[in-house]
Amino acid sequence: MSRKNYVFTSESVSEGHPDKLCDRISDAVLDAFIAEEPEARVAAETFATTNRVVIGGEVGLSDKDKLHDYMDRIEAIARACIKDIGYEQDKFHHATCQVTNLLHEQSAHIAQGVDAAKGKDEGAGDQGIMFGYASNETPELMPAPIHYAHAVLRRLAEVRKDGTEPTLRPDAKSQLSVRYEDGKPVGVTSVVLSTQHADESQTSDDIRAIVEPYIREVLPDGWITGDTEWWVNPTGTFVIGGPDGDAGLTGRKIIVDTYGGAAPHGGGAFSGKDPTKVDRSAAYVARYLAKNVVAAGLANKCTIQLSYAIGVSKPLSIYCDTFGTGEVDEEEIERAIGKVMDLTPRGIREHLHLNKPIYERTAAYGHFGRAPDADGGFSWEKTDLADVLKAAL
């Protein structure tokens, strides 16, 4: 964006939103197979509706007997996810909903394009374009609207799960309109929060009284003023929620998962996909590169685009845009990236250590802007490439 003064809005959804529940199950299935075999091939999709969960897709393990054994564990994995999220309502309960497993072995025709062979490196799992973005407007180098929209829902989930606010239920959405002055976020012009709750007698005002202190707690001081508009459960009662209220599907919240609309998106979803799928791994490394460009002080904001062809190992293109904030030309940054980073699927996986069971935790509250974990989770949020990039210029 070239404008300096404007209002920009992003939304988030909770871990109990039907689509996010499906993302969680798909990534939990992925983690289970990767824990057994780090180079397992997985494309797991989940559908959820009233009293029913259906899991389908493709899985590949080198040991076919283990593959069949693991199929028997899928139902328990799904139920554990539903239980942890907190669904115990009449028409969607972790113990009583029907779980159907339709996973099957990966197509040999897909595998032949991806698998490494003599004289041929591992190819990309599909064609596509992937984007990464970073901005210095928050310490996490994320756009402020999506960062704080996630923070609101994460805090409400905490107080719901620890029993502090027992009337809150899992399904929720947030939306923040953030005012920018001179290109920096300075306040919130409107707050939208819809959350499922237990009691039909509770009004919108009752729910606002519960959630407002937590929303104020996670937003920077001074961002909420007397002019801030509040829309809490604006339709009134929200007792029927989760998959009983709206069907859920894996991969339907790709803007929530990334930058809240503040950056382009290539269209590919993440959850349920192993790291040979560049929809996921290349989007992660694009974020890693953009974040390190900004962390290195080379720009205040940065977009990176990568493109791939199925079965081809190296990216077809590398694109950088610093929106006029760069300390060096974008072409120099592109060349430096090509020098210091192996952007083949294998190179990405090895550099970011992606062949680990680290994906279930990514399914809610954004894949980006999270703190790297000691076990390798969110490795794409590290800034260990910043000095290397500067040295390559």
From Swiss-Prot:
PROSITE patterns linked to this entry? ADOMET_SYNTHASE_1, ADOMET_SYNTHASE_2
Q: Name one GO biological process term.
A: one-carbon metabolic process
UniProt KW Metal-binding keyword: yes
Q: Under which EC number(s) is this enzyme classified? A: 2.5.1.6
**Xref: CDD domains:** S-AdoMet_synt
The record's remark on the cofactor is: Binds 2 divalent ions per subunit.
Q: What InterPro entries is this protein classified in?
A: ADOMET_SYNTHASE_CS (IPR022631), S-AdoMet_synt_C (IPR022630), S-AdoMet_synt_central (IPR022629), S-AdoMet_synt_N (IPR022628), S-AdoMet_synthetase (IPR002133), S-AdoMet_synthetase_sfam (IPR022636)
Q: Which residues bind L-methionine?
A: E58, Q106, D246, K277
Q: Where in the cell is it found?
A: Cytoplasm
Binding-site list for K(+)? E45
- Which UniProt keyword terms apply here? ATP-binding, Cytoplasm, Magnesium, Metal-binding, Nucleotide-binding, One-carbon metabolism, Potassium, Transferase
Specify the domain of life of the species encoding this protein: Bacteria
Q: Which residues bind Mg(2+)?
A: D19
GO annotations of cellular component type = cytoplasm
> What molecular function terms (GO) are annotated for this protein?
ATP binding; magnesium ion binding; methionine adenosyltransferase activity
Q: In which pathway does it act?
A: Amino-acid biosynthesis; S-adenosyl-L-methionine biosynthesis; S-adenosyl-L-methionine from L-methionine: step 1/1
Its subunit composition reads: Homotetramer; dimer of dimers.
- What does the sequence similarity comment in the record state about its family? Belongs to the AdoMet synthase family.
User: Which HAMAP family does the UniProt record give?
Assistant: S_AdoMet_synth1
Described by its record, this protein's role is as follows: Catalyzes the formation of S-adenosylmethionine (AdoMet) from methionine and ATP. The overall synthetic reaction is composed of two sequential steps, AdoMet formation and the subsequent tripolyphosphate hydrolysis which occurs prior to release of AdoMet from the enzyme.
Q: What is this protein called?
A: S-adenosylmethionine synthase
Gene designation: metK
